Amino acid sequence: MASDFWLIAGLGNPGKKYEDTRHNMGFMTADVLAERWTVNFADHKGLAMLGKSVMNLDGRTVKFFLAKPLTYMNDSGNAVASISAYYQIEPDHIVVIHDDMDLEFGRIKVKAGGSAGGHNGIKSIDRSLGTPKYARVRMGVGHSKRGANAHDNTVNWVLGGFGPDQRKQLPEFLADGADAAEDIIFHGLAKTQEKFNGR
């Protein structure tokens, strides 16, 4: 029987050296949610830091798990699939938060299904769940210079930090990402897309 819990997974890479990098937008947004809803993380089978709590919004209450995979980005699917199988959470009750180079810094787009857009964490989750039909909060980080060394530029870009201006805007951006995850759960995908995708 499917659980009535939701699973929110913020993607990133574990370890100090990745802490404030663009690729860790998901982790950082998960931390905002953890603070808002008093989530205490504990280890889940060595695959993720996982906590659970309850959200109370608009007179409704929703139980949820919050996960930060420890598998490194490219194997995020192992963690997400393990949690969803263990707690019987269906893909339509999963929200994944991740960085997205196709969007400028500060922009958020919400979607379910469709292409992974070259994001290895999303490709891994699609593979492990056997479907792309879960909700995604795409957090814009802009993109590196194209050109001869495009792959290396991309790797250096996503594993790089934020400039001073972006760092100033980051708290508000992360709060918006957390709002988007909550809105998907409480108001559904279409309404959340209307609110965020046109900004």
Swiss-Prot record:
Q: Where in the cell is it found?
A: Cytoplasm
Q: Which domain of life is it from?
A: Bacteria
Q: Name one GO cellular component term.
A: cytoplasm
> GO annotations under biological process?
protein quality control for misfolded or incompletely synthesized proteins; rescue of stalled ribosome
Q: Which GO terms describe its molecular function?
A: peptidyl-tRNA hydrolase activity; tRNA binding
Q: Where does the record place the site Discriminates between blocked and unblocked aminoacyl-tRNA?
A: N13
Q: What Enzyme Commission number(s) does the record list for this chain?
A: 3.1.1.29
Q: Which residues form the active site?
A: H23
Gene3D superfamilies assigned to the protein according to its UniProt record, in alphabetical order? Peptidyl-tRNA hydrolase
Task: Give the main location.
Answer: cytoplasm
Record keywords, A-Z: Cytoplasm, Hydrolase, RNA-binding, tRNA-binding
Quote the SUPFAM superfamilies the UniProt record gives.
Answer: Peptidyl-tRNA hydrolase-like (SSF53178)
Q: Which reaction does it catalyse?
A: an N-acyl-L-alpha-aminoacyl-tRNA + H2O = an N-acyl-L-amino acid + a tRNA + H(+)
Location of site Stabilizes the basic form of H active site to accept a proton?
D99
Which intervals of the chain form a coiled coil? none
Family matches, as PROSITE patterns: PEPT_TRNA_HYDROL_1, PEPT_TRNA_HYDROL_2
Q: Extract the InterPro entries matched here.
A: Pept_tRNA_hydro (IPR001328), Pept_tRNA_hydro_CS (IPR018171), Pept_tRNA_hydro_sf (IPR036416)
Residue sites binding tRNA per the record: Y18, Y72, N74, N120
What is this protein for, i.e. what is its function? Hydrolyzes ribosome-free peptidyl-tRNAs (with 1 or more amino acids incorporated), which drop off the ribosome during protein synthesis, or as a result of ribosome stalling.
Q: How does it assemble?
A: Monomer.
Sequence similarity: Belongs to the PTH family.
> What's the protein name?
Peptidyl-tRNA hydrolase
- What organism is this sequence from? Bifidobacterium longum (strain NCC 2705)
Q: What is the lineage of its organism?
A: Bacteria, Bacillati, Actinomycetota, Actinomycetes, Bifidobacteriales
